[in-house]
């Protein structure tokens, strides 16, 4: 499906964005290995999270889904062998976190996914899980499909070579089945939803800076989880409202966990008008309403420990940088190369077609703020974050923009285009 987007004069209104994707995945997975009923409200109903639901069902978990409410009837730590290959679709979170759970199961499972998943690196998960005692085979180069036989695991001390919430989470989930303590050390803080949710369910997880101490032996108990709005989905509205004149948008009930708010930190650093109100905590997660108004942005340098806090938002930050005064440099973001597409290449190529002065580097991009884009026919590369970022570019461009394969937004935000029509 192709979509057409035309220049918009301003954005005004109050909206909600769908439930957080990371938290929705984790609520279903951890609820499945807990004892008793877990009820999840405001669950994100999208292709990625439904892949998690289907995989857990194939492992014997009874899950009832009604609109955005989910009931998970947990089986405890030990699941049932699937008679089928588990297909995670496009979901990197599903395959990597599920490998952690399957490392503790005394049966063999094969995991696969779509073409995008088969290009994404699995070695970063295979290495620590193998050290813990799981037996894992993968396609040459450590790519999916992956065959995993779990069993008796041992605790390890593991220094992660890259900051990755998915890798960290996989090890933490495996640690529930291990004999002895597991210690994980990150090079920089990545999103910490797994730590917070495991603590909510009753696991003994201790955090000391960039170190996480995981102790086995706790029984997980079913919980009621209220999923806050996803800041990664809110990011598109935050950027658009900053850039379009005479705009004011309020986004209700958004997750503002400090490991996820890099987009707000960066926009404020660029001079953006973003304010958090009505701050509170639900299920250990910080939530707020976000108020965004039009502003004039200036270019900055983005890198270092900030990158894991905004890795998914860099494509839309690139759009903001086109309309900022001066030059924006994004560095230390090599991880973008192994997302659903190579997002460095995708964004430099497609914004370039629209007239942006944007240049690819080894670990990021350099954007000169020209304040101008022209409409063009652009490719999404079947990458939801690229498609949504190009939609924002189209709202700001002169003339019309056509986005190819725009239905890929269904992975994380099926009503994305409709929500913009409300403003």
UniProtKB/Swiss-Prot annotation:
The keyword Cytoplasm applies. It catalyses: 3-phosphoshikimate + phosphoenolpyruvate = 5-O-(1-carboxyvinyl)-3-phosphoshikimate + phosphate. Pathway: Metabolic intermediate biosynthesis; chorismate biosynthesis; chorismate from D-erythrose 4-phosphate and phosphoenolpyruvate: step 6/7. Its EC number is 2.5.1.19. Keywords: Amino-acid biosynthesis, Aromatic amino acid biosynthesis, Cytoplasm, Transferase. Its main location: cytoplasm. One of its GO terms (molecular function) is 3-phosphoshikimate 1-carboxyvinyltransferase activity. 3-phosphoshikimate binds at residues 21-22, 26, 164, 166, 312, 339. It comes from the Bacteria. Phosphoenolpyruvate binds at residues 21, 92, 120, 166, 343, 385. It holds the Pfam family EPSP_synthase. It is an enzyme of class 2 (transferase). It is found in: Cytoplasm. InterPro entries: Enolpyruvate_Tfrase_dom (IPR001986), Enolpyruvate_Tfrase_sf (IPR036968), EPSP_synthase (IPR006264), EPSP_synthase_CS (IPR023193), RNA3'P_cycl/enolpyr_Trfase_a/b (IPR013792). The active site is at residue 312. The keyword Transferase applies. One of its GO terms (cellular component) is cytoplasm. One of its GO terms (biological process) is chorismate biosynthetic process. HAMAP family: EPSP_synth. Belongs to the EPSP synthase family. Monomer. Catalyzes the transfer of the enolpyruvyl moiety of phosphoenolpyruvate (PEP) to the 5-hydroxyl of shikimate-3-phosphate (S3P) to produce enolpyruvyl shikimate-3-phosphate and inorganic phosphate. This is 3-phosphoshikimate 1-carboxyvinyltransferase. The lineage of its organism: Bacteria, Bacillati, Bacillota, Clostridia, Thermoanaerobacterales.
